[in-house]
Regions:
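Bacterial N-terminal signal peptides that target proteins for export
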Residues: 1-14
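Hydrophobic core
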Residues: 15-20
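Sec/Tat signal peptide C-region and signal peptidase I cleavage site
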Residues: 21-27
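Extended, well-structured beta-strand/loop surface patches
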Residues: 28, 33, 39, 57-108, ...
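An ectodomain-focused feature that recognizes extracytoplasmic/extracellular
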Residues: 42-52, 60-61
Length: 205
């Protein structure tokens, strides 16, 4: 029993140490310095989801913070301030072809995803900077696109997640889900134009 207790205590101490190291790394990023990258388990696990529309792949890479009994909206995530829409490094969205988001055009590429939450309306920001740590170094000058959407009450999601819903031949709704909130935004693709371009490229080769 004593040896088992020692093992459990040692494991708890090790996990606590890892959390402190991760917290230290994040604090250094907040201060603008670049810490040595540590390959350690994250408290907020990495997640990724991909949806294909026609020939176009849309991939969201993010980290998944947990509610953990906390008051999220307006507290952990303040209203009126830029939020990284996840945890740790930038949440990123990659489009393999040009798309529209909420009807507004956005060229193919990888973008840092940020939001500005509010009670009744959120701003979703696609930034040309996709490699920063969260939103701490966010610069409005690097915006590629901003759209406004409305949040909706939803079933509880203990860990933050992104999903694709209402998938159609030329569109899908990407949704951020966390706590009891869902934030949907529609992504559209000109499938005919993408297919025509693909066929032309194949004929050239």
């Amino acid at each position: 029993m004593r040896s088992m207790s020692k093992c459990i205590l040692g494991l708890c101490a090790g996990l606590a140490g890892l959390s402190l190291l991760a917290g230290s790394a994040e604090a250094q990023f907040k201060n603008g310095s670049q810490p040595t990258e540590l390959n350690i388990p994250r408290v907020s696990q990495r997640g990724s989801v991909t949806q294909r529309i026609g020939l176009t792949d849309i991939t969201i890479n993010y980290h998944r913070p947990a509610v953990g009994g906390r008051e999220i909206w307006g507290k952990i995530v303040p209203y009126g301030k830029v939020w990284r829409a996840g945890a740790n490094e930038n949440t990123t969205v990659t489009f393999t072809d040009d798309v529209t988001v909420e009807g507004k055009p956005l060229v193919a590429g990888t973008y840092g995803l940020h939001t500005i939450p509010d009670k009744d309306q959120w701003t979703i920001i696609f930034s040309k900077n996709s490699t920063s740590w969260g939103s701490f170094s966010y610069d409005e000058k690097e915006d590629a696109l901003r759209v406004t959407v409305k949040p909706h009450p939803a079933e509880l999601f203990e860990q933050l997640a992104y999903t694709f819903e209402d998938v159609k031949p030329d569109s899908a709704v990407a949704t951020l889900r966390w706590e009891k909130l869902a934030l949907p935004f529609q992504i559209g693709v000109d499938v005919k134009a993408v297919v025509l371009r693909s066929v032309k490229n194949e004929l050239r080769n």
